[in-house]
Amino acid sequence: MLNILNLICICLNFALYSSSFFFTKLPEAYAFLNPIVDVMPVIPLFFFLLAFVWQAAVSFR
């Protein structure tokens, strides 16, 4: 039980302190990558959706 509580606390701390990380700006040298960085968090969802499309293509065997 104690291990689960420790894990929850660690996750909460990470979520609280990393939230400011998501809103930081890229350095000027990498400013041209802003559009790519904005799309990157959505890429795993495309793979998730691709799994359903693939299963539909093979009739959910």
From Swiss-Prot:
Topology with respect to the bilayer: Single-pass membrane protein
GO biological process: photosynthesis
Record bears the keyword Nucleus: no
TM segment ranges: 40-60
Cleaved propeptide residues: 1-24
Keyword hit for Thylakoid: yes
GO CC annotations on file: chloroplast thylakoid membrane; photosystem II reaction center
Subcellular location: Plastid, Chloroplast thylakoid membrane
Primary location group: plastid
Keywords: Chloroplast, Membrane, Photosynthesis, Photosystem II, Plastid, Reaction center, Thylakoid, Transmembrane, Transmembrane helix
Pfam short name (any one): PsbK
Function: One of the components of the core complex of photosystem II (PSII). PSII is a light-driven water:plastoquinone oxidoreductase that uses light energy to abstract electrons from H(2)O, generating O(2) and a proton gradient subsequently used for ATP formation. It consists of a core antenna complex that captures photons, and an electron transfer chain that converts photonic excitation into a charge separation.
Subunit relationships: PSII is composed of 1 copy each of membrane proteins PsbA, PsbB, PsbC, PsbD, PsbE, PsbF, PsbH, PsbI, PsbJ, PsbK, PsbL, PsbM, PsbT, PsbX, PsbY, PsbZ, Psb30/Ycf12, at least 3 peripheral proteins of the oxygen-evolving complex and a large number of cofactors. It forms dimeric complexes.
Protein family (similarity comment): Belongs to the PsbK family.
Protein name: Photosystem II reaction center protein K
Species: Populus alba
Taxonomy of the source species: Eukaryota, Viridiplantae, Streptophyta, Embryophyta, Tracheophyta
Gene designation: psbK
